[in-house]
């Protein structure tokens, strides 16, 4: 007779994991899900195994809003090794080209402004983007190159941190869809020496604070030594995933109507339009909705807590 499946928990919130180097995002996602005994979990944009840093993991109803974190700005600190290009544009790849590095800090500072603002970036072949249903990295591992279209990205800030040849360290504030490996590869070509990512750490996703992260070893220790209620204390509320949207409080009647999936007329004195966070009179998070041009609240994604 098959052993009955262990029942998980309907636990809801966002856990800010400081992802360790060497583990894939999906691997740590499954570990965190198991530590919390959660029925449902999802991450908000993969980090390469080489990379460390912030990986928000959504549990339960928070998974409904993971796309909004995926679409949010990110901050990284990256150390590039100049003079070497690899096939993956990071330290885990095969060396494909070596060049002499004879750059000064002044040379680098003169180039950096060309990599800020609205740019077009061609994604690396070693990415999870799909072609005919298969990730590009699977083609790359078979030495097959697929033509990729350049995609619009925004580098809000590219801050010089240090340069001790051949290592250059930068802080990057960027839009969704930015490949730091590609950015460094492109920068290396512009500098005339080539480059690849040696160290990569994600500092922030959206406006989540770095000091709210917990490292994997600490979480694992808690899961082995403490009750689940202790782990639950480290979950951030579901609505933090959509904190960038304005907050709207509904009356009891409006809350009931929204609960039935109905559109509700809204006395829009503040003239707020677009996506908003909805709350009950008791300040309970209900979900997100769109306020239309004719002042109607149209439910988008509602929670079931």
Curated annotation (Swiss-Prot):
Its EC number is 5.4.99.25. The gene is truB. NCBIfam families: TruB. GO terms for molecular function: RNA binding; tRNA pseudouridine(55) synthase activity. PANTHER family: PSEUDOURIDYLATE SYNTHASE TRUB1, TRNA-PSEUDOURIDINE SYNTHASE. Responsible for synthesis of pseudouridine from uracil-55 in the psi GC loop of transfer RNAs. InterPro entries: PsdUridine_synth_cat_dom_sf (IPR020103), PsdUridine_synth_N (IPR002501), PUA-like_sf (IPR015947), PUA_sf (IPR036974), tRNA_psdUridine_synth_TruB (IPR014780), tRNA_sdUridine_synth_fam1_C (IPR015240), TruB_C (IPR032819). GO terms for biological process: mRNA pseudouridine synthesis; tRNA pseudouridine synthesis. Gene3D superfamilies: Pseudouridine synthase, PUA domain. It catalyses: uridine(55) in tRNA = pseudouridine(55) in tRNA. This is tRNA pseudouridine synthase B. Pfam families: TruB-C_2, TruB_C_2, TruB_N. The active site is at residue 48. Belongs to the pseudouridine synthase TruB family. Type 1 subfamily. Keywords: Isomerase, tRNA processing.
